């Protein structure tokens, strides 16, 4: 499957350096695809002993990437969900550092849960948000 995705994907610029914040299920797959495309990528996990971890980001434990961890980053993808209180840990802890950088692209990987129960119907970004679950409402 990864090889098929690589064959169908557009490579990023040669000088691209991607930071994936949250290397769990989805973030881990994205990280592997970016690496397979030959692009430099750094992936955060809650622990360096986690598979695919290049740096640690665990805001609940006070483990925040340093400014030097962000050096050279051109693209950022966050998959980290908001806290139970609705705060985005990435914006809270890294927002000011990221704003100072010349980023080419910043993205947030959310959930289809923000569209609510669509009874199996396809949804897109053009559909109105209608989250039913508290977790989806925070996203």
Where are the model-predicted features located?
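Hydrophobic, well-ordered beta-alpha structural blocks that scaffold small-molecule cofactor pockets
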Residues: 1-60, 66-67, 78-79
């Amino acid at each position: 499957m990864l090889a098929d995705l690589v064959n169908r994907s557009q490579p990023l610029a040669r000088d691209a350096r991607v930071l994936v914040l949250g290397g769990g299920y989805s973030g881990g797959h994205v990280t592997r695809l970016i690496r397979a495309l030959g692009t430099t990528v750094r992936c955060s996990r809650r622990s360096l002993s986690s598979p695919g971890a290049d740096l640690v980001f665990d805001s609940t434990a006070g483990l925040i990437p340093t400014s030097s961890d962000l050096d050279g980053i051109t693209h950022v993808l966050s998959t980290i969900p908001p806290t139970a209180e609705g705060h985005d840990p990435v914006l809270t802890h890294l927002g000011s550092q990221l704003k100072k950088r010349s980023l080419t692209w910043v993205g947030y990987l959310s959930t289809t849960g923000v569209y609510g129960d669509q009874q199996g119907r396809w949804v897109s970004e053009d559909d109105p948000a209608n989250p039913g679950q508290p977790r989806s409402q925070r996203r």
